[in-house]
């Protein structure tokens, strides 16, 4: 079983954690932006059939 040789420093751990958090933030922002464009009808990547009532 693979075991790390030395302890990871606190700063390196914090940097990696922040990178991981930032990825989630950008993914959420993209999803929100896509949902917003779908709701306003400005989406160019999805074709939503509009129903007239």
From Swiss-Prot:
Keyword Ribonucleoprotein: yes
Protein localization: Plastid, Chloroplast
GO biological process: translation
UniProt keyword list: Chloroplast, Plastid, Ribonucleoprotein, Ribosomal protein
Disulfide bonds: none
Molecular-function GO term, any one: structural constituent of ribosome
Chief site of localization: plastid
GO CC terms: chloroplast; large ribosomal subunit
InterPro entries according to UniProt: Ribosomal_bL32 (IPR002677), Ribosomal_bL32_plant/cyanobact (IPR044958), Ribosomal_zn-bd (IPR011332)
Superkingdom: Eukaryota
HAMAP family found in the cross-reference section: Ribosomal_bL32 (MF_00340)
Family per similarity comment: Belongs to the bacterial ribosomal protein bL32 family.
Name of the protein: Large ribosomal subunit protein bL32c
Organism: Coffea arabica (Arabian coffee)
Gene it is expressed from: rpl32
